[in-house]
Amino acid sequence: MSRIVVLGAGESGAGAAVLAKVKGFDTFVSDMSAIKSKYKEMLDRYDISWEEGQHTEELILNAEEVVKSPGIPNDAPIILKLKKQGTPVISEIEFAGRYTNAKMICITGSNGKTTTTSLIYHIFKSAGLNVGLAGNIGKSLALQVATDQHDYYVIELSSFQLDNMYKF
């Protein structure tokens, strides 16, 4: 069984962890901050190991791949160590994209992302399409892919979410 480590346990990280677990990965989540109770409950429900308030290197550096939440800088010490040893570090969006055949409409840019994303989602939903809303608004893409597959996803992507995307 492959080992996936998820760094950050907010909406993005918790969703990525659930998807990893559902797909059969040995999954571990680490967050330097306190994890909100709703995400702890989600991780516990899926029997996912987690830690908060630290990044225990021996539990992280043995990952075959790491899913990094967008709030963690690429120059964080643990990220630099992972990259130095050659461990792939990817985004939640990149990870989730591997497990869906849905069509994805992604919106990025400086201004108007949320409005544009919401408008497109509303148009699709009003047309009766099976559509999910993800990214900076709505549930994480990974959580939706794990729990309620859609035919379409409308995704708002910040510049931070574009980091660590390679094949999406």
Where are the regions that the model predicts?
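Phosphate-binding loop of NTP-binding sites
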Residues: E58-L61, P70-F168
